[in-house]
Swiss-Prot record:
Signal peptide: none annotated. Mg(2+) binds at residues 40, 51, 146, 148. SUPFAM superfamilies: Nudix. This is Isopentenyl-diphosphate delta-isomerase 2. The gene is IDI2. It comes from Homo sapiens (Human). Its cofactor is Mg(2+). NCBIfam families: IPP_isom_1.
């Protein structure tokens, strides 16, 4: 690992590589902890290292989804368009708590504030709906990748945004049709989109979007989608 060149990575991103993430098995049972760096190295992923994560899809009251473009100084998938916020609960008592996925929802509140500058009082853990879980794996490049048991969370609220440039290059709100257009542009090689945004859009959002007033029928708390 010592010979990996990270000169291009933002200093704050380097510091976050030492955060302790929650290591799980394929059924989301906690089996330990490891650094963010180790969890995202392909050499460890190929040996089966798997960690807990989350993806947030945030809609405003006009039913437009917040899409962010990842900073060019992110370690994985730099410059890619992605979901509203994706990150990890940390290996600490508050974010390990599993009842009603409260630990993950606390982590999501923390990262929505850190990445997008959304004040904590604007989105509480109670505003964050735990929808389902998916298990995914993706390579960013020959060194770095993702292998996650990912909690899919939904928020529908108007918020104030002040993105951290070390995390987020740009933000935009898209209608359902505009999101499909973005995915079509990615298929033509015109833009870069994270694999998990495509997964979320194609596997889940097409069903949820017409029913944002009440997504309760689509909640799947005990299912892990293998994608």
């Amino acid at each position: 690992m010592s010979d990996i060149n990270l000169d291009w990575v933002d200093r704050r991103q380097l510091q976050r590589l030492e955060e302790m993430l929650i290591v799980v098995d394929e059924n989301d049972k906690v089996i330990g902890a490891d650094t963010k760096r180790n969890c995202h190295l392909n050499e460890n992923i190929e040996k089966g290292l798997l960690h807990r994560a989350f993806s947030v899809v945030l809609f405003n009251t006009k039913n437009r989804i917040l899409i962010q473009q990842r900073s060019d100084t992110k370690v994985t998938f730099p410059g890619y368009f992605t979901d509203s916020c994706s990150s990890h609960p940390l290996y600490n008592p508050a974010e390990l708590e599993e009842k009603d996925a409260i630990g993950v929802r606390r982590a999501a509140q923390r990262r929505l504030q850190a990445e997008l500058g959304i004040p904590g009082e604007q989105i509480s853990p109670e505003d964050i709906v735990f929808m389902t879980i998916y298990h995914h794996k993706a390579k960013s490049d020959r060194i770095w990748g993702e292998h996650e048991i990912c909690y899919l969370l939904l928020v529908r609220k108007n918020v104030t945004l002040n993105p951290d440039p070390s995390e987020t290059k740009s933000i935009l709100y898209l209608s359902q049709e505009e999101l499909w257009e973005l995915l079509e542009r990615e298929a033509r090689g015109e833009v870069k989109v994270t694999p998990w945004l495509r997964t979320i859009a194609e596997r889940f959002l097409y069903r949820w979007w017409p029913h944002l007033d009440d997504v309760t029928p689509f909640v799947e708390l005990h299912k892990i989608h293998r994608v």
